[in-house]
Amino acid sequence: IENDKRGIEKLRLAYKNVLFAVPKNVYIIGMMNTADRSLAIMDYALRRRFSFYEIEPAFGKDNFKNHLKANGVTESMIKKINDNFIALNNYIADEKNSGLGSGFRIGHSYFCTKPNCDEDKWYANIIKFEIQPMLEEYWFDEKDKVGEWMGKIK
């Protein structure tokens, strides 16, 4: 929230006869997927009122590797995840080839849950039920591109 909207000065709420102030030590943290085109109009309003911090996908980063290890994921699967999604995200970020751009890169959170089955099945389920539908939406009119990348990351 803007600094001039914080502190001891209270404002009367529009729909209730109540005074309200946001304390200086209260922070509002929200998350937004910038790839969601339906948020575009709201996005401009939010950007005027809040500070934004972009979180980069953590593929290839030590913290992500350590998290996967702590969840019991093998070194070979960690390498597979990182290699596949670094390559896919590099392609997605190249707007000229992908038609998308860096705001459409796939985040690491899909792989942050502890595997609840064999890790190959865990990975295959994430690809089939999380990643593939997203790629099909991204490239809804380019089935060959979806097929190509599904073949590369399976």
Can you annotate each of these PLM segments?
Residues 1-154:
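C-terminal regulatory/interaction module of P-loop NTP-utilizing enzymes
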